[in-house]
Amino acid sequence: MSDNFYDVLGVSRDASEEEIKKAYRKQAAEHHPDVSDDDDAEERFKAIQKAKEVLTDEQKRQQYDQLGHDRFTEADKRGATGGGGPGGAGGPFGGAGGAGGAGGFEDIFNQFFGGGGGRGGGGGNRPRQGQDLRTGLTIDLEEAFEGATKEVTLTRPTQCDTCDGAGHPPDADVETCSQCNGRGQVQQVQQTPLGRVQQTSTCPRCEGSGELYSEDCADCGGDGVVREEATLSVEIPAGIRSGQSLRMEREGAPGENGGPNGDLLIEVDVDVGDRFERDGDDLRVNEAVSFPQAVFGDTIEVETVDGSVEMDVPTGTQSGETFRLKGKGMPRLRRRGRGDLYVKVGVVIPDSLNEEQREALEAFAEAGGEDVDVGGGFFKKLKSSF
């Protein structure tokens, strides 16, 4: 597999962001370690994630195209790529975000390739996608088995309707920022490992807009966003496991300068309950059988997630033996077939016997040539043998 990020996702160099995301979803679904049986599935999935991370970030993609794969990767290892996320959050490679712009190597790249962050670490007034948001959702085993439609409620940032995200009333007085002279960026000389360079960064006074307004929006306080409660309907695919996440596109934080919303990532927790244990797509369950059933063999009913099935208990079954019911486990996520159900048998030894049962077991012991103390030791011995 080629290391080139475009080749990893199978897209051309002029692919749009939507084409890249579509290719990522296809590759991720095919090569996720929980889905693929390939030995290198985990490493390949990491490469797919990395390729998507870089190529869907406008600034990182520009750096990648300018530097090439090898030089970009080396710069990445030194923490020299990427920028801060919206709202001042640090980028995935350690670049600082926030209204003051990024620092270090990111500023060098900005100087070389035309950077300068806008509000919240953006790039001038270019449209920027909003942050991805995360939340959790708990479902039961039956819902994970069948798939379900669930509702998730969260409080999230959304564009302020009062000012349409501008952060100020439409009739507010506006003046050109005197610190950057309306450019939204300021320049300064910084000492770096490459020597003294002139860097361009976001104007700290106007946060990259180049303008100052006489008053802020009363509802959002100038941020352009407010926090609201939202209830969303999410489709749960059959076979999902605890720890896996579902992505709802464009349900995240609002973008900047007309950019699209981020995505909402929903981490699923599957409550298996008390009866079953889950191991990937397989299930495990304990079933009790009587002493005569274990000795003579029998057919018993075993409850599965989707109903009961018959299972043969062979003659002479020992307590602790495990039997496999093929295809009676969980559905394989986005693949055909199901896992297996493993049934561990436990032989139940009676605590007390009536006279007829006692005589029968005494005869059983004598027929086997066992010299036992029927008054108490025999049954203790019998229990301990199971």
Swiss-Prot record:
Q: What is the required cofactor set for this protein? A: Zn(2+)
Q: Where is the composition biased (Gly residues)?
A: 80-104, 113-125
**What CDD domains does the record point to?**
DnaJ (cd06257), DnaJ_C (cd10747), DnaJ_zf (cd10719)
Region (Disordered) spans which residues?
22-132
What cellular component GO annotations does this protein have?
A: cytoplasm
Q: Where does Zn(2+) 1 bind?
A: C160, C163, C217, C220
Where along the chain is composition biased (Basic and acidic residues)? 22-35, 43-79
Ranges: CXXCXGXG motif repeats: 160-167, 177-184, 203-210, 217-224
One Gene Ontology term from the biological process aspect of the record: response to heat
Q: Where does Zn(2+) 2 bind?
A: C177, C180, C203, C206
What InterPro entries would the database entry show?
A: DnaJ, DnaJ_C, DnaJ_domain, HSP40/DnaJ_pept-bd, HSP_DnaJ_Cys-rich_dom, HSP_DnaJ_Cys-rich_dom_sf, J_dom_sf
Stored Pfam families: DnaJ (PF00226), DnaJ_C (PF01556), DnaJ_CXXCXGXG (PF00684)
UniProt keyword Cytoplasm, yes or no: yes
Q: Where is the J domain?
A: 4-68
- What UniProt keywords apply to this chain's record, in alphabetical order? Chaperone, Cytoplasm, DNA replication, Metal-binding, Repeat, Stress response, Zinc, Zinc-finger
Taxonomic superkingdom: Archaea
Keyword Calcium listed: no
Q: Which stretches of the protein fold into CR-type zinc fingers, per the record?
A: 147-229
- Stated role: Participates actively in the response to hyperosmotic and heat shock by preventing the aggregation of stress-denatured proteins and by disaggregating proteins, also in an autonomous, DnaK-independent fashion. Unfolded proteins bind initially to DnaJ; upon interaction with the DnaJ-bound protein, DnaK hydrolyzes its bound ATP, resulting in the formation of a stable complex. GrpE releases ADP from DnaK; ATP binding to DnaK triggers the release of the substrate protein, thus completing the reaction cycle.
Matching entries from HAMAP family are given as: DnaJ (MF_01152)
User: To which protein family does this belong?
Assistant: Belongs to the DnaJ family.
Protein name stated in the entry:
Chaperone protein DnaJ
Q: Which organism is it from?
A: Halorubrum lacusprofundi (strain ATCC 49239 / DSM 5036 / JCM 8891 / ACAM 34)
